[in-house]
UniProtKB/Swiss-Prot annotation:
HAMAP family: Ribosomal_uL2_B. GO terms for biological process: cytoplasmic translation. Belongs to the universal ribosomal protein uL2 family. One of the primary rRNA binding proteins. Required for association of the 30S and 50S subunits to form the 70S ribosome, for tRNA binding and peptide bond formation. It has been suggested to have peptidyltransferase activity; this is somewhat controversial. Makes several contacts with the 16S rRNA in the 70S ribosome. This is Large ribosomal subunit protein uL2. Pfam families: Ribosomal_L2, Ribosomal_L2_C. Part of the 50S ribosomal subunit. Forms a bridge to the 30S subunit in the 70S ribosome. Residues 223-274 are annotated as: Disordered. One of its GO terms (molecular function) is transferase activity. InterPro entries: NA-bd_OB-fold (IPR012340), Rib_uL2_dom2 (IPR014722), Ribosomal_uL2 (IPR002171), Ribosomal_uL2_bac/org-type (IPR005880), Ribosomal_uL2_C (IPR022669), Ribosomal_uL2_CS (IPR022671), Ribosomal_uL2_dom3 (IPR014726), Ribosomal_uL2_RNA-bd_dom (IPR022666). PANTHER family: LARGE RIBOSOMAL SUBUNIT PROTEIN UL2M, RIBOSOMAL PROTEIN L2. It comes from Vibrio atlanticus (strain LGP32) (Vibrio splendidus (strain Mel32)). GO terms for cellular component: large ribosomal subunit. Keywords: Ribonucleoprotein, Ribosomal protein, RNA-binding, rRNA-binding.
Amino acid sequence: MAIVKCKPTSPGRRHVVKVVNADLHKGKPYAPLLEKNSKNGGRNNNGRITVRHIGGGHKHHYRLVDFKRTKDGIPAKVERLEYDPNRSANIALVLYADGERRYIIAPKGVNAGDQIQSGVDAAIKAGNTLPMRNIPVGSTVHCVELKPGKGAQLARSAGAYAQIIARDGAYVTIRLRSGEMRKVLSEGRATIGEVGNSEHMLRELGKAGASRWRGVRPTVRGVVMNPVDHPHGGGEGRTSGGRHPVSPWGVPTKGFKTRKNKRTDKYIVRRRTK
């Protein structure tokens, strides 16, 4: 994997920094694991914008990624690594001994030709998936299940990982990249190692059009809107907004805690660090 800074042959190329991975598959993805991925432009069934800054972008298919890893005891061979336009991490196409192929999140250090496995008897090595009760304390893991059998929900993006720091009865305590420490059920599964493509954070898109290719539209500041559109809007000439920063719906945007799920507060040992 290489970090490539483009030559300034045009204003749009001047600031581009690309991550080039020669190991990625250059052909088409595996067709049986593709699904239609239609766009809605951030609109709901009434045609109203429910998520701002979404629209346009290149067409692409959704890759069906196996987040459950339930084919226990069946060894699999990594056939190739692929780019996935739906996420920051790369994905790996694996071929199981029974002939089935599946996509998984590509772990760091796992390459084409490597063997992986899932189940309670799997070895402690990168790419193998086990229940967390069978993973040694101190291990680095990714694709962590919050509910056993639901599939991985934590530490799935490029370069992400969590560390198992304690085991207590039916729960294990994990530390996330954000600094948050939380309890999860030890029956839940996790994959050994960390997610690959950690250089993703070093890339620079270089121009607005590169964001538009990805379906991301511009973000307009509230102080340049009209009063009907934003609490900071209006005024004669340039203004400061006239109040503490808020969202378009009046919710404070700086330092205001918005977590509402009190039911799961008991599982958070330590809140994330700023």
